[in-house]
């Protein structure tokens, strides 16, 4: 495998359509989660966001081995009933929960390919030490979604919570001490215009798709 297309937080936007255009020229497509709950200032209706989500589910079903759908904090709020994220869609809650429930087998919380680890918000050492003290990063990547659910709603003060660090769906990019056994790729923290790409991790939540070349390690935007 050499090229992975990455679609960060969608929130009802259409930029992910680039993945449909390029599906035959990449080896894998990884969505980083957060498909719904659009931002009001972007003038995307909640119903339009649901339609985009339905298209993404169809895209996954049409390309089951090539498309990876990760769960974000907004998605987990509908999937696991442990609280609501900002802009939670109470009006269409039943429909959204049914979509997730019917298709939950299509989603996961992390994806690893070689030396690259994809999650919605990234893995910090503090989170592993505090909430999964018996697990290092290698053992973490053996855990199932069901096993990880109890530890997802850890939110730090940077996101309005009272935990010392956020989970893999809640960690803010400002939370340091990133686990660096694998090169981490995540979204969650919306950035103004440019991604943050370091030699240890990349935060790509800038409303566009990216292409990762596994052979060279280069990450570039393609939208």
Residue ranges and their predicted role:
Residues 1-5, 111-117, 198-199:
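Beta-strand-turn-beta hairpins that frame and shape the catalytic cleft
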Residues 12-16, 37-39, 74-80, 125-126, ...:
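Active-site environment of divalent metal-dependent phosphoester hydrolases
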Residues 93-105, 200-204:
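Short, solvent-exposed secondary-structure boundary motifs
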Residues 167-222:
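Conserved beta-sheet core of the metallophosphoesterase superfamily
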């Amino acid at each position: 495998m050499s090229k992975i297309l990455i679609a960060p937080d969608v929130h009802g936007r259409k930029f992910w359509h680039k993945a449909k255009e390029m599906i035959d020229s990449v080896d894998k497509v990884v969505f980083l989660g957060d498909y719904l709950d659009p931002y009001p200032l972007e003038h995307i209706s909640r119903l339009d966001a649901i339609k985009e989500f339905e298209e993404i589910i169809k895209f996954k079903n049409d390309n089951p081995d090539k498309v990876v759908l990760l769960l974000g904090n907004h998605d987990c709020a509908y999937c696991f009933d442990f609280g609501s994220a900002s802009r939670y869609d109470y009006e269409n809650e039943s429909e959204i929960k049914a979509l997730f429930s019917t298709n939950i087998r299509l989603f996961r919380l992390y994806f690893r390919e070689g030396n690259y680890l994809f999650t919605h918000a990234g893995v910090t050492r503090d989170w592993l030490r505090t909430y999964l003290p018996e697990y290092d990063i290698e053992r973490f990547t053996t855990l199932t979604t069901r096993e990880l659910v109890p530890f997802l709603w850890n939110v730090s003060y940077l996101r309005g919570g009272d935990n010392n660090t956020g989970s893999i769906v809640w960690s803010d990019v400002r939370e340091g001490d990133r686990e660096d056994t694998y090169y981490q790729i995540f979204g969650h923290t919306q950035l103004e215009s440019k991604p943050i790409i370091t030699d240890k991790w990349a935060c790509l939540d800038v409303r566009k798709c990216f292409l990762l070349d596994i052979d060279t390690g280069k990450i570039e935007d393609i939208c």
